């Protein structure tokens, strides 16, 4: 079972996440576990599309991450993803270049915290 206090301590809005999950803590936990299961592949995609300078695909990944992060209450990461998605739409490579590394770091830190809260750290 998720430790809600740990999630909140690290900035997740668990009330918002639960709202998106019909106020069902078990469903919320399933959403977080699915989010974690997809994280390695999503990071790989973001890194690949960034290196290839494929802004369309990078923007699609950012859009998806924006929504899934919001659904679990990860507002800060969701907002960062929104900014990158918008930068892709505007072909603002300078903004993408300045934000990409921090965005990936932020995402990795969040997944580490989620693993800790879910008791998946060893």
Where are the regions a protein language model picked out?
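Two-component system phosphorelay core
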Residues: 1-122
